[in-house]
Amino acid sequence: MNTILFDLDGTLIDSSEGIIKCVLYTLDFYGIKEPDTAKLYRFIGPPLSESFERYYGFSHEKAYEAVQKYRERYNTTGIFECKLYPGVEKCIRTLKEQGYQIGMASSKPEVSCKRILEHFGILPLFDDVVGATFDGTRDKKSEIL
C-alpha cells in the first residue's frame, strides 16, 4: 500500500498568525521588543528552542524556558489561530478514496497536531500522526520521520 506523508505547518495549515503572536508573547516576557514581525516567520517550521537560540541568542536552558512560556499562550489560544488551506480536505479525502494511507509528520508537538486536525474535522482521515514530544526527546524532523 502506498503512503503519503504531509507536514502540518505551511502544508496543511497556515499557522503563521498563532505562531507569530505566541513568539511575540514570549519575547515580551523577556523584555524583547521585535518591531519587524516579518522576522518571526523564521519560527515557522523548525523546533522553537533552536529558533530562540539562533535568532535571539538564548542559551539552551533559556530557550527551553522560552518554549514553555510560548506554550502558555499557544495551548489555550494560539493553537486555533490558524487556517486550513483551501482544498486540503478534498485532496486528502480523494487520496483516501484512491487507497492511499495518509500520514502527517511535524516538528510541532504530536498532541497539538492532533488537536488542530480534530478542530478542522480531518483527524479521522489520517492513518498516523507523528509529532514532537513535549519533553524534547523527539523534536527534529529526522527523529519524527
What residue spans do the PLM features occupy?
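Short, acidic loop-to-helix structural element flanking the phosphoryl-transfer center
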Residues: 76-104, 110-114, 139-142
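Active-site neighborhood of HAD-like aspartate-dependent phosphohydrolases
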Residues: 1-42, 56
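Short helix-capping segments at alpha-helix termini
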Residues: 28-33, 59-61, 97-98, 121-125
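Helix-loop "lid/cap" segments that line or gate small-molecule binding pockets
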Residues: 26-27, 47-60, 116
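Substrate-recognition "cap/lid" segment bordering the active-site pocket of phosphatases
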Residues: 110-145
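Metal-dependent phosphoesterase signature
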Residues: 53-93
